[in-house]
């Protein structure tokens, strides 16, 4: 037990989240925050647990609090972007993904998410450029390859779509699962639709 250790409570909360005890995780983050209200990590960790329960407004509040203390906190910016996306505010999500990738240029998932938000918003050229750059730098990054598959297909480039998809199926088969894309990875609806159309050859 960690009667007075904020970090201990926060770490135990993270473990609880991993094993599926989301409410227990939130309880531990609450204890960590009450012991050390100025420590940032428990707010981010609590936000992640709140997201797991679909408590978007609570998660948003936690991430906004972190950003108010540390405007360049790329984890909070990225997570807040995911919340905005989950509530269909893709323009806000795009700007936040952009900030997260600006403050941590090596954060490949933030850059891929930025491209996906651009894809959703109809900024197809920007999305394609970003995805191609990402794949050049990280050839085994499945998210960017899957996104480019969907984008190629929507542009009528079947050959390019096929070659990107071959790599995806070897790297991460979850990308063919529509529910996983919606609920876990949380892609925007248009890229999901285009990827599913590709898979079904529509």
Whereabouts are the PLM-identified features?
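Structural marker of alpha-solenoid helical repeat scaffolds
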Residues: 1-2, 35, 69, 102-103, ...
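TPR/TPR-like (Sel1-like) alpha-helical repeat modules
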Residues: 132, 136, 140-142, 146-176
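Terminal, low-structured helical/coil segments at or just beyond the last alpha-helical repeat
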Residues: 162-202
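Conserved alpha-helical positions within TPR/SEL1-like repeat arrays
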Residues: 7-18, 27-30, 40-52, 74-85, ...
């Amino acid at each position: 037990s960690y009667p007075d250790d904020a970090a201990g409570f926060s770490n135990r909360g993270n473990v609880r989240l991993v094993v599926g005890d989301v409410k227990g995780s939130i309880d531990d983050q609450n204890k960590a925050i009450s012991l050390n209200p100025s420590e940032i990590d428990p707010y981010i960790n609590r936000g992640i647990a709140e997201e797991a329960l679909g408590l978007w407004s609570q998660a948003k509040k936690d991430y906004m609090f972190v950003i108010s203390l540390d405007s360049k906190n790329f984890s909070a910016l990225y997570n807040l972007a995911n919340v905005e996306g989950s509530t269909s505010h893709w323009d806000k999500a795009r700007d936040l993904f952009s900030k997260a990738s600006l403050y941590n240029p090596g954060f490949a998932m933030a850059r891929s998410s930025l491209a996906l938000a651009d894809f959703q918003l109809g900024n197809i050229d920007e999305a394609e450029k970003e995805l191609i750059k990402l794949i050049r730098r990280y050839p085994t990054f499945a998210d960017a390859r899957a996104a480019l598959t969907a984008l190629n297909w929507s542009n009528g480039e079947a050959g390019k779509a096929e070659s990107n998809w071959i790599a995806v199926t070897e790297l991460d088969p979850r990308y063919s699962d529509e529910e996983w894309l919606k609920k876990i990875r949380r892609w925007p609806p248009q890229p999901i639709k285009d990827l599913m159309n590709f898979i079904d050859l529509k």
